């Protein structure tokens, strides 16, 4: 059976800040983004089901684990591991964090292919798992 991919995009607004170090010059104060998060799942195409997994199930999962978790929040203050000081709240780190939450909640037989976090029209980060 062929492998198929399904991508769902959600949006949320969140605030973050970077440490006052040379690599983050100019972005060390609190600032917000209207993030777009694209999550792509993969699995065996099931002709009887019409695809990889139920779209309402994926939509509900993203609503709970992404929008419900991050929308209106301050990443550095409200969301572990950022609030614990373990990770810097970058797009790359956010993509990895979303990956960890979504991968653990997918139905059997469905895998995660990519998490893409867009901070704006000209900046995005992707995580595709450890390869």
Please describe what each predicted stretch is.
Residues 1-131:
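Charge-rich, low-complexity N-terminal segments
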């Amino acid at each position: 059976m062929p492998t198929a991919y399904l991508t769902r995009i959600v949006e949320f607004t969140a605030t973050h800040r970077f440490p006052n170090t040379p690599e983050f010059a100019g972005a060390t104060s609190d600032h917000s983004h209207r993030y777009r998060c694209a999550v792509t799942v993969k699995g065996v195409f099931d002709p009887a089901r019409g695809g990889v997994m139920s779209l309402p199930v994926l939509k509900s999962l993203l609503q709970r684990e992404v929008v419900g978790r991050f929308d209106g929040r301050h990443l550095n203050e409200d969301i572990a591991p950022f609030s614990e000081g373990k990770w810097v709240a970058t797009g790359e780190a956010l993509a990895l964090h979303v990956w960890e939450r979504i991968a653990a909640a997918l139905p059997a037989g469905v895998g995660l292919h990519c998490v893409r976090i867009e901070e704006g029209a000209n900046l995005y980060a992707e995580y595709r798992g450890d390869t």
